[in-house]
A protein has these predicted regions:
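Regulatory and interdomain segments flanking nucleotide-handling catalytic cores
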Residues: 1-501
Length: 501
């Protein structure tokens, strides 16, 4: 008997698969392969097996998907089994697929979806993918990227490597346009030919402010989980997923610097996720523009949808971002882990903002320069180098920043550079807080008074005033701890000024 079913799919271990290498071509290739399987090939496969009219795609992006299927349960089971094998074959064993389904009815959509997700979770926990060492011997060559068993030689650019089948497939997809295609088409409409960088080194060479400096920008949606749980119908879910996916893609394309040799490459784009590796001087402006455009676009798309407009209070959805700065030779794994940590910090700040609502959290941005410290974890760097304890606790930064504050600190950093204040004086200003509260104040005043031009002094004073700092400290009374917190914007400001063109 043919019934209606809701089918949910999920690809576990995406981060390990996509970001488990330090080669740009493999990272973007793995991401493109996953995106192609997820957004296009899964729906085509299901329709070919079960019939065009028997498959309705609710959404399929970001490593997950949801479909409404009309079929006999035995046919659905057989199709799901074949689909899992299809994912393994297409990725050469690099990806696996989890599926769950339940009988579907429009009246009980959310309950049916919960049952399908429960079945998917059950499959995941009962059949875990347990990593194990592969066979190694002195006469077997290891893969140069993942240490698996190499199967063939592969060339990209001037480099030749011995790779396993999984990594070869990543490289082959990395040679294609992949996620770059939509951005290239967007640029072509503007009469621009977008030239993609071939490796991390080339991205660093395109940094105009400080050569070889790069950044990894990682963004994720705020309060999305709560909003998804409030959805009651299939149509609402479809509207929501399409609006989010389209908005994050459009925001990314419009925010990227679109001129000639693009100093960036898109590593992850879909659902509410965004990751771009780019030159250090373009990262902060890109993050600001992407966050602002995403909120504007979702607000516009939901304006005609009473359900979402009511839940969001007429506002749009938001994303928070983490920016890990480094050099082109900084191991990607370090920049990735730091961007994840910074993203969590931003999302936490948004969830604690006084302007947050039940389904809304303001966008925040956090950033860190990995090459300035020895610690891998951002929290360790800040605890070791950016906290003073004399005689009371002093924090030498104000990160993360809300979107208005992030825009303000960028503008003031530009003003410092445009005022032609000598670079050595700016560096000394940035180091002043590290001297302690009293000596730091004296050093800051000395440098301020020693700045001869009135316009330059005004730029320094305006920047400190905007963030409530008095040469250079800001004291905030913490009522919960019954103590005074001392912070400064000066360190953050000078760090950011170092990446202004």
């Amino acid at each position: 008997m043919r019934n209606h079913y809701i089918l949910v799919i999920d690809v576990p271990g995406i981060k390990e698969y996509v970001f488990g290498t330090d080669r740009l071509v493999e990272i973007r290739g793995a991401s493109a392969l996953l995106d192609d399987l997820n957004r296009r090939k899964t729906e085509i496969f299901l329709k070919r097996k079960l019939g065009e009219s028997n498959v309705e795609c609710v959404f399929s992006a970001g490593g997950a998907g949801q479909f409404v299927i009309t079929a006999q349960e035995d046919s659905l089971k057989a199709c799901v089994k074949e689909l899992k094998g299809f994912f393994v074959r297409e990725s050469k064993g690099g990806l696996r697929l989890l599926c769950g389904w339940a009988e579907f009815s429009e009246e009980n959509y959310s309950d049916c979806l919960d049952q399908a997700h429960f079945r998917l979770k059950k499959e995941k926990e009962e059949n875990p993918l347990i990593p194990c060492t592969q066979l190694h011997a002195g006469y077997i060559r290891e893969c140069d990227s993942c240490s698996g068993m190499a199967s063939r030689s592969n060339s990209y650019g001037d480099e030749e490597r011995f790779l396993c089948d999984i990594c070869v497939e990543k490289v082959e997809y990395g040679k294609k346009r992949g996620l770059w295609r939509e951005f290239a088409e967007y640029c072509e409409k503007k009469g621009i030919k977008a030239e993609r960088p071939k490796d991390f080194k080339e991205v660093g060479e395109r940094c105009l402010a400080r050569k070889d400096y790069t950044a990894l920008v990682y963004a994720d949606g705020n309060a999305m989980g709560k909003l998804v749980k409030a959805i009651k119908t299939k149509e609402q879910f479809k509207t929501f997923s399409e609006a989010v996916d389209q908005s994050v893609r459009e925001a990314c394309h419009e925010a990227l610097p679109a001129e000639g040799k693009i100093p960036a490459d898109i590593l992850l784009l879909g659902g509410d996720d965004l990751m771009v590796y780019m030159s250090a001087d373009t990262a902060f402006p890109f993050a600001l523009d992407a966050a602002r455009k995403f909120e504007e676009k979702t607000k516009e798309k939901f304006a005609s949808e009473p359900f979402f407009s009511r839940l969001l209070g007429g506002k749009g959805l938001t994303i928070s971002l983490g920016i890990a700065y480094g050099k082109s030779h900084t191991p990607f794994s370090i920049m990735f882990s730091q961007s994840e940590e910074l993203l969590k910090s931003s999302k936490k700040a948004g969830s604690q903002d006084t302007n947050k609502g039940e389904y809304y959290a303001p966008a925040y941005i956090d950033f860190h320069i990995s090459s300035s410290y020895n610690q891998i974890k951002v929290s360790d760097s800040r605890k070791t180098h950016l906290h003073l304890y004399e005689p009371s606790a002093v924090k030498l930064y104000q990160k993360p920043y809300s979107l208005p504050d992030a825009q303000a600190i960028l503008e003031h950093a530009r003003n410092l550079i445009n005022a032609d204040i000598p670079g050595t004086r700016l560096k000394r200003l940035g180091y002043a807080p590290f001297m302690g509260k009293i000596n730091g104040t004296l050093e800051c005043l000395k440098l301020y008074i020693g700045t001869r031009k009135k316009e330059q002094r005004a730029v320094i004073r305006d920047a400190l005033d905007r963030f409530g700092c008095l040469f250079p400290w800001r004291e905030i009374k913490n009522e919960k701890r019954e103590a005074v917190e001392v912070t400064t914007v000066l360190t953050d400001l000078i760090e950011l000024a170092g990446f202004i063109k």
